[in-house]
Amino acid sequence: MIPGEIITKSTEVEINNHHPETVIEVENTGDRPIQVGSHFHFYEANAALDFEREMAYGKHLDIPAGAAVRFEPGDKKEVQLVEYAGKRKIFGFRGMVNGPIDESRVYRPTDENDAYAGVFGDNGAENVNKKGGKRS
């Protein structure tokens, strides 16, 4: 062995193999590329990404640490998400959680929410979060 040498296994390393997986379709409805990193709380990703936000609550991309997924304008692709482990507390990002991951804290659109949003013209294709998530 050489000092500082790293000896790795000859087999592939499986990541997140003990976490439940969720696959969702995501579309970039914006006019600029959007990149989401491996540990970013996907529920809080850029509002120009159109997807079922409820499905992403408490989850991050199932990719190696330090990697990212890039969405070009108009891109539509499926991504695989896995649940956060550990203490399951999320702070920062867009400030939509700032505490424990708890399903009761997920924003779920209702007819009343949609009627209220309609007053301000937020009821058509321009509503990038029409499938769920927090309206900003």
UniProtKB/Swiss-Prot annotation:
GO molecular function terms listed in the Swiss-Prot or TrEMBL record: urease activity
EC top class named in words: hydrolase
HAMAP family: Urease_beta (MF_01954)
Gene: ureB
Pathway: Nitrogen metabolism; urea degradation; CO(2) and NH(3) from urea (urease route): step 1/1
Entry similarity comment: Belongs to the urease beta subunit family.
The protein's name in its UniProt record: Urease subunit beta
Gene Ontology BP, a term: urea catabolic process
Annotated NCBIfam families: PRK13203.1 (NF009682), urease_beta (TIGR00192)
